[in-house]
Regions:
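Pre-active-site segment of Zn-dependent metallo-hydrolases
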Residues: 33-116, 144, 175-197, 221-235
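Metallo-beta-lactamase
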Residues: 23-27, 31, 118-253
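Charged helix-capping and loop-helix junction motifs
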Residues: 111, 252-259
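A short helix->loop->beta-strand "cap" motif at the edges of active sites that frequently abuts
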Residues: 53, 121-125, 263-267
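Structural motif
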Residues: 52-55, 76, 164, 213-215, ...
Length: 268
């Protein structure tokens, strides 16, 4: 099964125009490893609200560190879960390093993470759910940032930052913190025993922008009941960003079911 099999199922959805305030739009910019390409290791996106608030979603490994010239002003950093390909254990040394198939991720961000380093450099708030905020607050402090910039938003309510509403929604995925991020003796013990530290459940997000656009960011997940009851029927997002990875996340057919039957956005 290839990702191509998803496209016929959702192509019609993607052609439907979004109904938002015509005087203002949300700008969406992918920050992939290769300019002009969409590669399988790419995660990061910047969402810019009409009022100028800029949100970085899952910096991962393709944002070339805190000095990446594509970042610009960042007000909020979202991290769906603690795995290295989303939090950012290492990253490209520069944009376009390596290739789509073999990205150069030789620059280490450990033990702080790419996301934390970017938040410290830009002064952004890191907005997460579950048990992640306390861990990230400590990481911010260790990296020379303000621990108060780690903001909690658990399932059930929204935080409003810079005029943009942000909430977390359930995702069916593991969320252990690897020993590499923990560091010191405890980190070594975790690596030696092959286990990870507890961070609570993984999350997705619903982000509501000042022009009324609601966006569902699935994070890594499988099919969940909440995609219908919470995301689709309560938040009613017009745009969805759906992670597809088959064994590790929803497969192409499963993702098509989530989009067409549960969330029902107007664009994907």
């Amino acid at each position: 099964m290839t990702i191509r099999s998803l496209f016929p199922a959702v192509a019609l959805i993607a052609l439907v125009p979004l109904t938002v305030n015509a005087q203002s739009v949300v700008k969406v910019t992918p920050l992939g490893g290769q300019e002009g390409e969409f590669c399988r290791f790419d995660r990061a996106m910047i969402f810019e609200d009409p009022n100028g608030t800029r949100i970085l979603y899952d910096a991962g490994r393709t944002v070339a560190g805190a000095e990446d010239p594509r970042l610009g002003k960042i007000d909020v950093v979202l991290v769906s879960h603690m795995h290295g390909d989303h939090l950012g254990d290492r990253h490209n040394p520069a944009p376009n390093a390596g290739s789509c198939d073999k990205p150069d991720i030789s620059a280490s961000a450990l033990p702080n993470s790419n996301s934390v380093n970017i938040a410290v450099k830009t002064g952004a708030k890191i907005v997460t759910g579950s048990e992640m905020p306390s861990f990230l607050a400590n990481k911010l402090k260790q990296a020379g940032g303000d621990e108060k910039n780690s903001v909690l938003v658990r399932f059930g309510a929204m935080q409003t930052i810079g005029g943009v509403g942000i909430t977390t929604v359930p995702a069916a995925h593991s969320n252990g913190i690897s020993g590499e991020f923990v560091g010191q003796r405890l980190g070594d013990l975790l690596k030696e025993t092959g286990i990870t530290a507890y961070a609570g459940p993984a999350t997705g997000y619903v982000v509501k922008f000042s022009n009324g656009l609601a966006v569902y960011l699935s994070g890594d997940t499988g099919i969940t009941a909440e995609q219908k009851e919470v995301v689709g029927e309560y938040y009613k997002p017009q745009l969805a960003v759906m992670n597809i990875g088959d064994t590790f996340t929803t497969g192409p057919r499963e993702a098509a079911h989530v989009i067409n039957k549960l969330v029902k956005p107007k664009a994907v």
